[in-house]
Amino acid sequence: MKPDRRCASNRRGHQGRLVAPGKITIIAAMVIGVMALAACGSGDGSSSSAASLKQAASAKAAQQATAANQTYVDPVAYSMNANDSLDASQVAEKAAVMNYTWTSGSTTVNYTTTTGHLTASDSSGNPEASMSYVAYTAPSTNGAPRPVTFVYNGGPGSSSIWLRLGSFAPTRVATPDPLFGTNWPNYPLVNNAESLIDTTDLVFIDPPGTGLSEAVSPNTNQTFWGSDPDVTVMRDFIERYLAVNSRSSSPIYLYGESYGTPRTDMLALSLETAGVHLTGITLQSAILNYFADATEAVAVENSTAGLALATDTVAGYMPGYAEVAAYYNQVSPAPASQSAYATQMAQFVTTEYSAFKSYSQSWVLSQIGDPNALGRPVFPSSKTLTSWEQPSSLTLQALKGYFNANPFSGSLISGTTIGRYDGRVSLPNSDSRLQSDGDPSDILISQPFTNALATQMPNYLGYTAPNATYVPLNDSIIGSWDFSHDGQALPDTIPDLLGALQLNPQLAVFSENGYHDLATPFFNTEKQLARLQTVSGLNPNLQVSFFQGGHMIYLDDVARPQMKSDLALFYQNAAIPGALTLKTLPAPWADEAAASTPTASAATTDAKAP
């Protein structure tokens, strides 16, 4: 029996700002829509945001009076529907330009926001898509070209709103993550002390069918809804931005989150092949090989054939799930640190890997809501679970929460649903908000971010589109996405990363991981990156760091300053304290393909370090 794909849709709908089934969150960019959305809650968040933005604007006017702000009313009626496209006559590369000052401690940076569209075109000059973007740029202080970083979320089907409003732009939405606080859903926009604007220019990109990015005829939006065409159009946008802004001599970086990480691997190889040489890439909350995440493989393929690496999935996920159990005091004795406990759990799952084989398929099918797809599910006996208490330090309750026929999110704590993006975020099962969205960590940010966007676009970015709607999350994309890549049904992008490193041995790679991320658990990422150990003589500039927090690590007020510090070192090409390297990563699972070979074509090939 094949599991019903609909049973897996909740799993698939939350991969790096993926879309929950049956839910499209749309923000009106038109003036009336902005007013309506801004009035959706109490005035605390919006008034605080307005005051903050006015203060920034006043400071800028005083310090840079010669800089002229240019607002822009975009007349184009953009559509994000699958079969829609713009006529070439409608395409215009226009933008709003605003000037502000960012301050953090004793550091002050005058910066410019540019919000609008550029046209991605193929090698023959034929337009492919008119793509919306927001760029934050600052003048060089030492005469050398500033780095420029291209930033995007994942999905597939997400705009760049989540990284742009949550991470390292000069302003951010102040969430009380992992709590909801008292002012949900009206969290304020504030000055972001951890912005990277003092380090790099930032260009946030919306892929076609998201934000206000639309294909240009004869293409349609759906033309680019696949692993390979997505990379092509993203590459062509980046090349256009570099050309229009004379940035080809700048250090060029990529920053992707969730599905944005396989996109980054593929995009890095595509850019390097095209002669655009990168300085570095950041992989945040990564899913680099869909086959090694059997829950995704089964859901996307709609087949139990996706269970081939189910044991790798169970073992790769468990350390992250255990960190969440520790947060809820389900680990005894309490861990000395998150790092120490991660090491303990890595040892535990490696030791018990063979034992997990008996339960792995049942576990994967249970997580996607179809435990009986292959008959009666098989799980460890109480005796076996009890024997695992001491080496894992997990309580029996936590072990039963992990190994059972129901998803972990509702099994760990009775009467409580915990988040998938961030396992520390929880709501009682009686909370009415769970009826429309089953992930508390998604609820935490979705409405607050869209509320903030509704005021930020016209007031701070100076951009309005009275005939269009901005689409943060397009639910129709993931259901239509062609995941095939490199001759396989799903993307395994470790070979792409290897290819980029072989073309550019100086390419720096930084992997950022949240201990409490249940969407892309950190140990799974370690094991995939470790496949690079199979390439004799390869010694990449790879660093892997870990932080408290979930999928969107930067929402955590402790993690975000640490991320900023690590990223500042990364941009200096310096060693990051505590980061793992390729040599110190744990060895890859024995049944994984070598780094040079896509998983599906060599699923039984042992991946052994030289």
Put a short name on every predicted segment.
Residues 35-39:
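C-terminal motif of bacterial Sec signal peptides marking the signal peptidase cleavage site
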Residues 48-148, 159-161, 166, 584-585, ...:
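Catalytic-loop region of hydrolases
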Residues 285, 289-298, 304-319, 376-591:
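C-terminal subdomain of alpha/beta-hydrolase-fold enzymes, centered on the catalytic histidine
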